[in-house]
Amino acid sequence: MLFRSRVGDPRTEVGKALLKERSPLTHVDRISRPLLIGQGANDPRVKQAEADQIVTAMQKKNIPVTYVLYPDEGHGFARPANRTSFYAVTEAFLSRCLGGRFEPPGKDFDGASITVPTGMEHVPGLKEALARK
């Protein structure tokens, strides 16, 4: 299969080594900037447990991480309300990390299933916006 030849075949030792080398967990010590992770709890490609692993590894290293989880999403955010809320989080997150302005969240979280297990403090206005939701 083309996919396995490009990213690694977990059924072979060579493939396992390739997957390990490409895994963010292998390189967590090299992450030096805040990270935003958006995850669908029902993602069949990137399991929630994998996102949980990188979040935990970053927390152990005291690397700032914001973890946004959507319990009703899979790979990619299909529900418009969830997409809108993630765009709002991303805009504020990037504003804090890179500088510049962002549109304060208004109704961006209405109807969204967004949860933020960790890192809410790295996104300006997120705590307040979710409290109004």
Model-predicted segments: where are they?
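Active-site-proximal cap/loop segments of hydrolase catalytic domains
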Residues: M1-K133
